[in-house]
Amino acid sequence: MRRGENIYLRKDGRWEGRYIKGKKANGKAKYGSVYGKSFQEVRSKLYPLKAKYQSIRERQGEASMTYQEWGNYWFTEIKSEIKQSTYSNYEYKLKHYVFPEIGEYSLNELNEMVAQRLFQALKEKKLKTTTIRAIFRIINQTMNYAIRKKQIKENPFLLIRFPKVSRIKQQALTKKDQKCLEKQAMREKKGKGIPVLLALHAGLRIGEIAALKWQDIDFENNQISIHSTYQRVLSSDNISRRTSLIYTRSKTESSVRVIPLSQILKKELLEQQKQLRGRYVCSNNDHPAEPRLLTYHFHRIRRKVHLNDVHFHQLRHTFATRCVESNGDIVSISALMGHSSSKMTLDTYADAMMEQRIQVVRQMEKAIS
């Protein structure tokens, strides 16, 4: 039995009132329901909800598919456009951190209050601010895509303000420590020290070293071509945190670069080439040696020379610092490092330029004296 205003008497004796929450992906209306023992009880519950969702639909649009449904749709749209490692990272962060918190909200129900609650929930999980920022950047991509597809009208997640993060500055090795590490790396058998030398003399990332093939090294023209990386990424079953190794093109166009081959590095690489027959410079049965193995060898080497609290990426940082100390220009150093901009290089290695600053001040003093 029906008595107007979308209120019904059900077979079980209860009254039910329905209100429109928005539209489904297929364009059909999505309804919400309230229940009560009488027509008047249901009516009193129904009117505030009708008004609430009328306001939501006018302000934010008709899309009532859940955020989780939209996120999964977005995954299918972007999968062929981005690297597998990037896709796995996006998928893990949304499925592990975001969907459990806000996945059941309809797109048009998402607002600043929901965004703020998510931010607080992530903080309570003791996540670093940098990680939370990364999660929100992914959410913003999904929401901005929803706006482009005319599913919603605005992105409330852009309203969240994050606390400033004090960047931890990486320390380059001293010249003395660098020499000790290099000497030990050269003494290592079976080429186990080669990754250390590639990082210190060419500024390569660990994944770039793992992917490096002999055909990428031009000994005649003294050049190393960098275009690929070998790394661990989350598998498609990424909720269980299983990983797999993939060989793929470098992360950005700026990461694809040509690096001059130093004479020290050339000598060591030629010796290494005589000992190995595989395609890869750092080989494991004619397969690229995985980054974790290279890192393991590095830690064994640095412990032999009593270097504590040093991680592999500091070797790359040391290479750049030595270039700056040698009065290399920022544009060239940025290109060697594979940075996306010279600003990034300046921001990262500004402290290493103190000697240049001192010289500038001295020149200024001479000019006015």
Task: Describe the function of each predicted region.
Residues 32, 108, 152-154, 164-183, ...:
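DNA breakage-rejoining catalytic core of tyrosine-based enzymes
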Residues 38, 60-63, 75-156, 167, ...:
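N-terminal core-binding DNA-recognition domain of tyrosine site-specific recombinases/integrases
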Residues 10-16, 21-113, 275, 281:
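N-terminal DNA-binding module of tyrosine recombinases/phage integrases
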Residues 1-12:
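Short N-terminal "domain-start" leader segments
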Residues 239, 260-308:
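Active-site/catalytic core of tyrosine-dependent DNA strand-transfer enzymes
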Residues 133-135, 148, 152-154, 159-214, ...:
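Basic, Lys/Arg- and aromatic-enriched nucleic-acid-binding interface segment
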Residues 148, 197, 201-208, 300-304, ...:
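C-terminal catalytic core of tyrosine-transesterase DNA break-rejoin enzymes
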Residues 168, 230-232, 337-363:
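Catalytic-site neighborhood detector that most strongly recognizes the C-terminal catalytic loop/helix
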